[in-house]
Amino acid sequence: MMKIYLMGSDQRIVRCARVSFAKDSYVDEKRDKRLIRYLFKHRHASPFEHNIIAFEWKKEKWIELLSKLENPTVQVYYSNGFVFLNLRNAINVWELLPDAVKERIKEAFPTTYGVIQRRGEIEDEELYSLPYTKDKAYVKEKIETSSGWIGLVDKLELETDMDFYTFVVECPLFVARQWMRHRFGSYNEVSKRYVGKEFLEFYLPKYIRKQAEKNKQASVDEPISESEVFIKKIENLISKSVKLYEEIIEKGGAKELARGVLPQFMKTRFYWTVPRISLDNFITLRTHEGAQKEIREFAEAIKEMVGYRGTDKKNVI
């Protein structure tokens, strides 16, 4: 019998979509089901990338599947006897998947399976009658850092280089932008086009660190002189920026433009689903002493939660 493993749920798709509105903990089954249908019909595909499918297969079968692909955007990976792909890619190669895999998808993501089968053209009555799977908890483990927090949402570990993990992260914008340079993975993030002052938090460091003398991009963990004065000025700048932001919104200004006045200390939240080989690369680079302190703390937290295996060393660069 084929070994098949899945990570995620119907709700996982909804969470990764609703994070755009900072409402990823909100649950309403009927609305959730309608949202899955809406995402599918309107080709909002990224939330489907956080559900992962792995099944045992011979490498020859995987190569045969790849040879039949006509869509160059589809990504299907092979590692240590298992095929890995996310649900978005599975939908795009649906006719090539083994029937047993489709049956497991039906069991694990029943609402989503119903939507896939109807290509989104499913009426409310039938949609509401479908089972709906939920995550057992918002996070399995959570670690606070000086600038935010990270939670382990889920993991699929088969002792391969392509084991998968999903995290939810809250951090300053400048940390998120560094984070998203790690491109082998999937992201969904709070959008300030949608969310106004209901999600408006800022990171304020305890002190302003000194610039490193020999490393142009690094700092020394010592306060500069008059650090307290500058921290106070930053607080004032944040306060003035928020006031201006709110004034623009109150006058009917678009949030997508008003957000431009908010400083980089503003926090964001995002979901990150990542394979082990990319995760290990993140840990290697971001625990280095030259990495920024704030993101280094997150990398150390990840290492504490799921360990480091060194799979990234297989890459030359």
Curated annotation (Swiss-Prot):
It catalyses: dUMP + (6R)-5,10-methylene-5,6,7,8-tetrahydrofolate + NADPH + H(+) = dTMP + (6S)-5,6,7,8-tetrahydrofolate + NADP(+). Its cofactor is FAD. Residues 55-166 are annotated as: Insert. Residues 100-317 form the ThyX domain. DUMP binds at residues 178-181, 189-193, 259, 286. PANTHER family: FLAVIN-DEPENDENT THYMIDYLATE SYNTHASE. This is Flavin-dependent thymidylate synthase. It comes from Aquifex aeolicus (strain VF5).
